[in-house]
């Protein structure tokens, strides 16, 4: 929500006072528009059901859920917000004392091959960072991705940095106050 207000919370991650100031502004804005909120996140299935029935008209959600709904009903589309989508890339980690580091690298290299990564994408609905995999992804999923994320949207993704200790607690307290507000 901060990005839509022209604020950059990620730039304030190393300055707790500045981050707290941003969160206070976000809290005030969220309380101001609380009458537009039907519900708060409890799970993906609930969110998809609310959109399917038309009980809600817009939602903040992951792209894969939006693409699933679009496959069911072309009138429902997932679009990146003008202020920028939030982005992260799931990663692989090998423990320092791994018993078979060579096998771990072989597995990572295997699943990141474009053809294999595309199979995972086709099964999960989540897109992949494997370069060239889009050539092997089902056409409808690939087209939905391209419709949601044109080059401008990709260039405007706000990539999550590591979250410093204590900020998630602060965010949770803001959400508690927003939910409790009249």
Where are these regions (language model features)?
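Extracytoplasmic/periplasmic, Sec-exported soluble proteins
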Residues: 18, 22, 39-43, 86, ...
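Non-transmembrane alpha-helical segments in soluble domains
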Residues: 1-2, 27-31, 48, 52, ...
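Ligand-binding pocket segment of bilobal, Venus flytrap-like solute-binding proteins
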Residues: 1-4, 8-79
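Periplasmic-binding protein-like
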Residues: 29-33, 72-96, 141
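Mature extracytoplasmic/periplasmic domains
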Residues: 85-86, 90, 95-155
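Conserved C-terminal helix/tail region of periplasmic/extracytoplasmic solute-binding proteins
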Residues: 49, 151-182
């Amino acid at each position: 929500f901060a990005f839509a207000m022209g604020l950059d919370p990620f730039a304030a991650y190393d300055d707790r006072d500045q981050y707290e100031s941003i969160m206070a502004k976000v809290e005030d804005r969220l309380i101001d528009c609380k009458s537009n909120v039907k519900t708060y996140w409890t799970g993906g299935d609930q969110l998809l059901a609310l959109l399917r029935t038309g009980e809600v008209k817009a939602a903040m959600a992951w792209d894969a859920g939006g693409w699933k709904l679009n496959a069911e009903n072309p009138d429902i589309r997932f679009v990146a917000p003008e202020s920028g989508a939030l982005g992260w890339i799931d990663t692989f980690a090998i423990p320092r004392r791994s018993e078979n580091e060579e096998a771990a690298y072989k597995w990572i290299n295997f699943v990141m091959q474009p053809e294999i990564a595309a199979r995972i994408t086709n099964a999960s609905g989540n897109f992949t960072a494997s370069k060239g995999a889009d050539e092997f992804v089902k056409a409808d999923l690939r087209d939905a991705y391209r419709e949601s994320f044109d080059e401008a949207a990709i260039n405007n993704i706000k990539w999550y940095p590591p979250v410093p200790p204590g900020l998630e607690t602060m965010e949770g307290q803001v959400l508690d106050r927003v939910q409790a507000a009249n």
